[in-house]
């Protein structure tokens, strides 16, 4: 990709690997399943060198935080690494941190989590890109009407966008879904927002 598109003016950068699952310590003697972090670090350093042969330093080299931005502190901190950015995926529907956003506490906790992860990337020494996010969330209140669900999704989406102010940019998960699924289809999810919110 870098040799083919690296000099194109339209290219902003290249992500080295999308969404690898990194092994992390879960206790004193246990680690989760995934790729050991030292393998990922070596891969990213080697890939950076190869990509930079074909792509100028004005273009970003992006690597995935693998869900753990704080784990990358002091990584690629040498002066030879230029314009390196961390990709953070911010989903709220399926992981251990998923909360019911139909409560004020759940909504504020979800948004605080976004801000915390973006701040962790900055503390690790990297600008962040929200490489994937959606309007999908947990709705545990069975009495919500379809209209109420739409209102919660709109508040959730606009609140998430407001939480991205410290990120270099964001990418909604999907531009278009086959059945126009509101939480996953950018045309539907972002369509009801005022244009000023998208700029």
Predicted regions and their residues:
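Aromatic-rich peripheral "rim/lid" segments of glycoside hydrolase catalytic domains that contact
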Residues: 145-199
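Extracellular glycoside hydrolase catalytic/binding regions
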Residues: 3-6, 10-13, 17-161
């Amino acid at each position: 990709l870098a040799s083919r598109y690296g000099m194109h003016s339209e290219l902003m950068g290249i992500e080295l690997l999308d969404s690898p699952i990194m092994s992390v310590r879960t206790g004193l003697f246990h680690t989760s399943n995934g790729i050991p972090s030292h393998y990922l670090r070596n891969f990213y350093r080697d890939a950076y060198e190869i990509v930079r042969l074909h792509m100028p330093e004005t273009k970003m080299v992006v690597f995935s935080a693998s869900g753990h931005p704080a784990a990358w502190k002091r990584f690629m901190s040498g002066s030879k690494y230029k314009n390196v950015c961390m990709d953070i995926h911010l989903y709220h529907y399926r992981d251990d941190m998923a909360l019911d956003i139909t409560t004020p506490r759940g909504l504020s906790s979800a948004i605080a989590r976004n801000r915390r992860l973006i701040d962790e990337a900055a503390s690790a020494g990297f600008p962040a890109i929200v490489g994937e996010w959606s309007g999908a969330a947990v709705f545990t209140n069975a009495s919500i009407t379809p209209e109420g669900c739409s209102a919660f999704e709109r508040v959730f989406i606009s609140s998430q966008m407001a939480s991205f102010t410290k990120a270099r940019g964001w990418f909604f998960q999907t531009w278009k879904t086959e059945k126009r699924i509101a939480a996953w289809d950018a045309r539907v999810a972002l369509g009801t927002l005022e244009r000023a919110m998208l700029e």
